[in-house]
């Protein structure tokens, strides 16, 4: 059976931490920020851990 390829779109959006958790950026902070409160944009800063339910699918796409 041939090797499965890494899904390039997934590889750009997610990364694996040292402990094996899958990390992602929070959505909603790219544009149209004028009407959003500073508090909201700060909350959307940083990384988040992918939920347990989505982890197997992401791992399969990343070929882990």
UniProtKB/Swiss-Prot annotation:
Top-rank lineage group of the source organism: Bacteria
Pfam family, one: Ribosomal_L35p
Molecular-function GO term, any one: structural constituent of ribosome
Name the UniProt record assigns to this protein: Large ribosomal subunit protein bL35
Any one of the GO CC terms: cytosolic large ribosomal subunit
Entry keywords, A to Z: Ribonucleoprotein, Ribosomal protein
Segments for region (Disordered): 1-23
Coiled coil: none
Entry's Gene Ontology BP terms: translation
Bias (Basic residues) ranges: 1-15
